[in-house]
Amino acid sequence: MAQTFTGRKRIRKFFGKIKEVAEMPNLIEVQKASYDQFLQIEEPKGGRADDGLQAVFKSVFPISDFSGAAMLEFVRYEFEPPKYDVDECRQRGMTFAAPLKVTLRLIVFDVDPDTGAKSVKDIKEQDVYTGDIPLMTMNGTFIVNGTERVIVSQMHRSPGVFFDHDKGKTHSSGKLLFAARIIPYRGSWLDIEFDAKDIVYARIDRRRKIPVTSLLFALGLDSEEILNTFYEKILYTRAKDGWRMPFDPKRMKGYKAVADLIDADTGEVVVEAGKKLTVRAARQLVEKGLKALKISDDEMVGQYIGEDIVNVHTGEIYAEAGEEITEKVLKTLGDAGFDEIPVLDIDHINTGAYIRNTLSADKNSSREEALFDIYRVMRPGEPPTLDSAQAMFHSLFFDAERYDLSAVGRVKMNMRLDLDAEDTVRILRREDILAVIKTLVELRDGKGEIDDIDHLGNRRVRSVGELMENQYRVGLLRMERAIKERMSSVDIDTVMPQDLINAKPVAAAVREFFGSSQLSQFMDQTNPLSEITHKRRLSALGPGGLTRERAGFEVRDVHPTHYGRICPIETPEGPNIGLINSLATFARVNKYGFIEAPYRRVVDGRVTDEVVYLSAMEEGKYYVAQANVPLDTDGRFQEDLVICRHAGDVLVVSPDRVDFMDVSPKQLVSVAAALIPFLENDDANRALMGSNMQRQAVPLVRSQAPLVGTGMEAVVARDSGAAIAARRAGVIDQVDATRIVIRATGETDPSKSGVDIYRLMKFQRSNQSTCINQRPLVRVGDVVKKGDIIADGPSTELGELALGRNVLVAFMPWNGYNYEDSILLSENIVKEDVFTSIHIEEFEAMARDTKLGPEEITRDIPNVSEEALKNLDEAGIVYIGAEVRAGDILVGKITPKGESPMTPEEKLLRAIFGEKAADVRDTSLRLPPGTTGTIVEVRVFNRHGVDKDERALAIEREEIERLAKDRDDEQAILDRNVYGRLSEMLVGKVAIAGPKAFKKDTEITKDALGEYPRSQWWLFAVADDALMSELEAIRAQYDESKKRLEQRFLDKVEKLQRGDELPPGVMKMVKVFVAVKRKIQPGDKMAGRHGNKGVVSRIVPVEDMPFLEDGTNVDIVLNPLGVPSRMNVGQILETHLGWACAGLGRQVAAAVDAYYGSKDQQVLRNALVKVYGPDDIEVLDEKQITELGENLRKGVPMATPVFDGAHEADIEEHLEKAGLNPSGQSTLFDGRTGEPFDRKVTVGYIYMLKLHHLVDDKIHARSIGPYSLVTQQPLGGKAQFGGQRFGEMEVWALEAYGAAYTLQEMLTVKSDDVAGRTKVYEAIVRGEDTFESGIPESFNVLVKEMRSLGLNVELLNSKTGRQTNPGTRENLPAAE
C-alpha cells in the first residue's frame, strides 16, 4: 500500500487475504451528494438540470392571475455568499445559510374583450430575495441557531403499484382476498380489492368502496368494452342436435371432463367422463384431426353472452353482453334465428367471472352515473353537477399539479405491469389502471406472485435533498396562493415582481423543517464514529413513514435484500429496533433513491476487476458468489461448486453460472460493526450492543488507537472530519497548537491563494458536552501530500480512530468484585489518567431590558462577600483559567426590584436627602450543584448600539490580532513566492531601465537586487517583450491577491465590531465554558467492542492487583463467566492477539535500544522485517525507521478485517514469534499474598472504552428545593433539582414493616404538607425534635376536585364540632 504521512509512522500488520478491488465510497457521501444535487449552487453553461430546487421552481411557476391578464415566470436563481461563516454561526447562535436570489419575469397581457386574444403589453424582470437556505458544512451537517444538526435519511415505501393479500385474516373462512394499491409520490391513493364474494371494488384515498366497473365507466368505457378488455370470446355455432365449440388445447390446462367429450364432426367420444385432460393430450387430439366439440343445450346454460345480440332491422336487443344464458334466452335466440352465439371464455378454473359479476352487481351503467357516484364518495353532502364531477375525477389522477407518480413510481409501475411509458409521464393513464386490474384478476386466478413490501426494491431512501425539496415545494405553494390574490388586488401595470412576492411562507417552511421536523436531529457528537453513524442512519419513522406502534415484525426484520445494503447488526435496542438502520459500508443510494451494493462482474467463470453497482431488484436476477470464495491466480474459481445467492435463496451452482461476486467481506456490515475485530466470532446480539456502545465512547485526554483493529480506523477518522487532512500538497511553513500554515507546492490557479491556513479547534464543546480538541502532527519543513492527516482530533491518534485505551486484562474472578459484569480496575489507571476525559459545560447569562429598567452585568452585587467575587474581573465576568466550584458566581448580574409604596415620611426624607440607590436584587449566574472545573472560554455578545465593556473589548482585540496574524503570514508567504520568482526572472538579464541610481544597460545581479527594497524591483525593465508581459501578469496577479487578502481581513474585522443579533429584549449575553475533568470512578460504565459492558465496581491499590512473573500488574480484571453464555468469544481472541502485539512491541523496543547503543541500523531493520515482511520496510529511510520503531514500543498494531481476519493458527504463530506461550495463558500471582494462582490465567491486551454514562451526571441529592404548583409535592429529576419518588411499593414496604411514624413523615412533611414542613424547619433551627404533621396539600386538591363535581366535603373538628375548612391555605407561609 502507498504509505501516507501518518501511515508510515505506525504501520498496521494486515491479516486480510482478500484483495479489495473497489474503493470504499466516502462515508458521508449520502448527505453531501444529495444536498449538492438539490442546491446546484454553480449554474452550468446550458442551465441547471431539472432537479431539486430548479424542479420545484419549474413546477410551481409560471403563476397566472385569476383573469389571465398577467403571468409571473421563473427565470433562474442564484445564491449570494453566506453572511457568516461556519465558526461565526456556531459562536453567535446563527444559522449557516445563504440568501437565495430568484430572477422573476412579470408579463402583462392586453386581452381583447371580444375575441379573448392575448397580446404582450409589458415585460418586467427583477431579482427577488426569497429567504435564506441553510447550507451544509464540509462534514455533512447543518448549523441551525448555533447547534449542529443532521437530517437523517428516511426509508419509505416506493411509489408505484403493489399487489398483496390479507393472508386470510379478514374473512372467517380464511379465504385470501387480493388487493392492489397504486401509491403516488403525492396525490390520491387508489386501492383495488376483492371482497369475500369475489366482487372487485375500488377505493380512492381509503374512502367508501365503489365497484371497480364504476371506475371503468368513469374512465369512458362501456360494458361491452369492459368485457372485451378482460375476457376472450368463443363463437358457438348451431349444429343439428346441439352446438359446436371450437377446440383449443391451450384452454384445456387442468381440465377434468364432467361428461363425455364428443367430436362434433365424427360423433366419436374423444375423452370419457371423469378423465383428466392434459395440455399434451389435447395437442395430440388436435393432431389427430379434432377441430370442434359437440355441446348440448344443457351445457350452454350458465355461460355468459360475449356481446350485445341485436335485431339488425328493428334494433331490438335480445340479450346484453355479460348476460347469463338460460334456457329461456336460448329459446328466444333460437326463435329469432340466431345460429351463432359469441360466449365469454370463462371456465371458472383458469378464468373467473369476477369482472362480469362486478358488472352485473354494479348499479351504475353509464359514465354520468359513475362520475356522480365517485363525486358523492369524495365530497359527501355536495350536490354534483356533471361538470364538477368530471373536473374532480380528472384532478384526482390525471392532473400533473395534483398527482405525481414521480420518475421512480413510473419506472416501478412499468416494471411490474410490463408497460413502456416514458418516465416523464408522471400521471396515471387509462391503460395503467386497466393493467393493474388485469394483474389483480390474474393473481386471483392463481397466476403470478404478490409483492413483498419489505423487499428493498419496494422501499426507497429519501435523503436530505429530497426531503428539503418537498418542504420547499410546500412553502412555494403557500406563496403561490398569496401571489395570485395579490395579482388580482393590485394595479398590475405599475407593480414589479418584488411587490407580489412575500418570502415569509417559504422561509417559515424551511425553518420549520430544520427546526422541528422529526428527521432533523441534534447531531450525536460524542465521538467521530457517532457523527458518521448519525449521518448514515436510515429511519423508517418520520412524516410519511411508519409509527413505532403500528410497525409489525416484518418491517423490522432482516430481509435477504439487506445484504450489502443495510447492516443486519447495527440497530437500536428497544422500541425502535429494526426501524432505524445503518447503511452498509460500500452501499450507495442511486438517483431513484434505491440502495445499491457493489459487485465484481464474473465472465465465463473468471472474476474480473470491473465493479458494478446493483439495486435489490436487479440483483435478484443474478447468481452472486461470496467474497471469500477461493480463487486461483488467474481469477478463476478453485472449487467445482460455488455457494451463491439468487433471488433471496442460497444455492450451490457450477462456476460458469455465476454472474457476480461480492467485492469485500465487510460490505454487508455498517461502519460501526466493521470496527469490531473478530466480529465473526461474536454472537449477533452482542455485536449489536458492541456497535451501539462504540458510539457512546467518550473522547479521552490521551487517546490510543487499538492494538487489534480492523483497518477501518483510518477511514473513519478521515471521513468524519475529526482529523484534519491536507487540502493540497505542500510544505509546512508554520505550526503551533492553534493553527497550521502550509505553503502549497503544486501548480496553483492564479486566482487562488498559494497558502492554506488550517485553524485547529481548541477545547470546544460538542453537542454532548464532550471536548473537541485538535493537535498538530506535523513539524515545520515536513512535506505532505493531498489527503495526508496533519492534525489529530478528538478520539483519533496518528490519523486513526481511537475511542478507548489498550489495557492489560486478566480473565478471572477476584473476591466477588466482578460479579454480574462488574469491572475491577487498578489504581494505576486512575493515577496515569488512562480513562480521564474532559467535558465542557456551557452556561449563559442574559441581561434583559425589564419593565422596571435594564438588568446590569456588574461586579457590584449587593450582600455578597469579597471572597465570592474573587474570580470576577472589573466587568463582573469570571476570568479564564479560574477554578470554580458549585455555587460560585460566574457572571455578576443585578435586576431592578419593584418599588414598594412609600410612606409620607419616607417621601419627605427622600426629598430632603435625594435619591437613595434603587432597590436591586442579585440574579447572578452561579455554577449549578455537582460541577467543578476550570473556565476555558468566555464570550460576550452586545446588542448593536450598546456600549461594550472592558472584557468585550479585550476579547475583540484578541480576535483582531489573530486575524491580522493570519493575514500577515499569508502575505509573507505570498511575497516570498512572488519576489522569489521575480528574482529568478531578472537575475542575469540586461536592464534597459531600473529604479533611480541604477545604470542603464547593465546586467542585473543578486547583489544589485539586494540594494533596493523589494517593492522597487518592479521598476526594472528588460528588452525581452515576452518576459516583460509575464512580469506584468505576475504583478497584476500579486496586486489582486494582496487586495483580496486585505479586503477579507477588513470584512472580518467589520463583522467583529458590528453588534450581535440577540433575541428580542436582550441587551447583552455572556457565555461561559467550564471544563470539567472526569477521572474514572466506581459507578462509571465501561465496555469492550464486543458488547461486553460493565460497571466499575472498585478501584484496587496497585499492590493488591494480580501480577505477572515479571512483576507487571494487570490493569483490569474481567469475569470469565461473562463470556460463555454471551457467546462473544471475539474478546478472548482479541486479548490473545493483543498479547502477541505487546510481545512483538517489546522485541522492537529492544531492537531500538540496541540501535541507539551500536548505531547499527540493521538490527532494527531485521526486527521490523520479522514483523511486517520486507515490502513495507525497505522504502523507509533511517529517520523514518527510528520513528516507526519508537511508535511500536507499546505494541505492534494489527488489523484483522471483519470476516477475513486472523485465524487461531495466525494468533498462535504470532504468540510464538513474540516468544510467548502459544496458549495465551500466563501464571498470575495474587498481589495480596504473593502466591501464584492455582491455574494459568488468560492475560492479554483488550481495548476498553469509557462510555458516556458517567456516575457524576447521575448522582444527585436534595434537601429542599422547588415544589410543584398544584400538589405542592417536590419536583422529580436531577435537571429540576427534584426529590426521589417514594412510590406505591415503597409505601407498602414501610406498612409491612410497621414503621408508622416514618411513613407519616414521608407522606406529609417530606412531601406536601406545606405548614408541616415549615414547622419542621423551625423545630430543627431551635434544636427541638418534636413536630406535628398537618393535612397534605394533595388531600385539599382531592376535596376541591370533589367539590367541582358537586359533592361538598367538610371536615369536622372532633373536639369542638366546628368545621375546619380544607382546601384553603390560611395563614400558610409562602412555599420555598
UniProtKB/Swiss-Prot annotation:
<keyword id="KW-0240">DNA-directed RNA polymerase</keyword>
<comment type="subunit">
    <text>The RNAP catalytic core consists of 2 alpha, 1 beta, 1 beta' and 1 omega subunit. When a sigma factor is associated with the core the holoenzyme is formed, which can initiate transcription.</text>
</comment>
<dbReference type="GO" id="GO:0032549">
    <property type="term" value="F:ribonucleoside binding"/>
</dbReference>
<feature type="region of interest" description="Disordered">
    <location>
        <begin position="1357"/>
        <end position="1376"/>
    </location>
</feature>
<dbReference type="Pfam" id="PF04561">
    <property type="entry name" value="RNA_pol_Rpb2_2"/>
</dbReference>
<dbReference type="Pfam" id="PF00562">
    <property type="entry name" value="RNA_pol_Rpb2_6"/>
</dbReference>
<dbReference type="InterPro" id="IPR007641">
    <property type="entry name" value="RNA_pol_Rpb2_7"/>
</dbReference>
<comment type="similarity">
    <text>Belongs to the RNA polymerase beta chain family.</text>
</comment>
<dbReference type="InterPro" id="IPR007644">
    <property type="entry name" value="RNA_pol_bsu_protrusion"/>
</dbReference>
<dbReference type="Pfam" id="PF10385">
    <property type="entry name" value="RNA_pol_Rpb2_45"/>
</dbReference>
<dbReference type="InterPro" id="IPR019462">
    <property type="entry name" value="DNA-dir_RNA_pol_bsu_external_1"/>
</dbReference>
<dbReference type="InterPro" id="IPR037033">
    <property type="entry name" value="DNA-dir_RNAP_su2_hyb_sf"/>
</dbReference>
<dbReference type="InterPro" id="IPR015712">
    <property type="entry name" value="DNA-dir_RNA_pol_su2"/>
</dbReference>
<protein>
    <recommendedName>
        <fullName>DNA-directed RNA polymerase subunit beta</fullName>
        <ecNumber>2.7.7.6</ecNumber>
    </recommendedName>
</protein>
<dbReference type="GO" id="GO:0003677">
    <property type="term" value="F:DNA binding"/>
</dbReference>
<dbReference type="InterPro" id="IPR007121">
    <property type="entry name" value="RNA_pol_bsu_CS"/>
</dbReference>
<dbReference type="InterPro" id="IPR010243">
    <property type="entry name" value="RNA_pol_bsu_bac"/>
</dbReference>
<keyword id="KW-0808">Transferase</keyword>
<dbReference type="GO" id="GO:0006351">
    <property type="term" value="P:DNA-templated transcription"/>
</dbReference>
<comment type="function">
    <text>DNA-dependent RNA polymerase catalyzes the transcription of DNA into RNA using the four ribonucleoside triphosphates as substrates.</text>
</comment>
<dbReference type="InterPro" id="IPR037034">
    <property type="entry name" value="RNA_pol_Rpb2_2_sf"/>
</dbReference>
<dbReference type="Pfam" id="PF04560">
    <property type="entry name" value="RNA_pol_Rpb2_7"/>
</dbReference>
<dbReference type="Pfam" id="PF04563">
    <property type="entry name" value="RNA_pol_Rpb2_1"/>
</dbReference>
<dbReference type="InterPro" id="IPR042107">
    <property type="entry name" value="DNA-dir_RNA_pol_bsu_ext_1_sf"/>
</dbReference>
<dbReference type="InterPro" id="IPR007642">
    <property type="entry name" value="RNA_pol_Rpb2_2"/>
</dbReference>
<dbReference type="InterPro" id="IPR007645">
    <property type="entry name" value="RNA_pol_Rpb2_3"/>
</dbReference>
<dbReference type="GO" id="GO:0000428">
    <property type="term" value="C:DNA-directed RNA polymerase complex"/>
</dbReference>
<keyword id="KW-0804">Transcription</keyword>
<dbReference type="Pfam" id="PF04565">
    <property type="entry name" value="RNA_pol_Rpb2_3"/>
</dbReference>
<keyword id="KW-0548">Nucleotidyltransferase</keyword>
<dbReference type="InterPro" id="IPR014724">
    <property type="entry name" value="RNA_pol_RPB2_OB-fold"/>
</dbReference>
<dbReference type="GO" id="GO:0003899">
    <property type="term" value="F:DNA-directed RNA polymerase activity"/>
</dbReference>
<feature type="compositionally biased region" description="Polar residues">
    <location>
        <begin position="1357"/>
        <end position="1368"/>
    </location>
</feature>
<dbReference type="InterPro" id="IPR007120">
    <property type="entry name" value="DNA-dir_RNAP_su2_dom"/>
</dbReference>
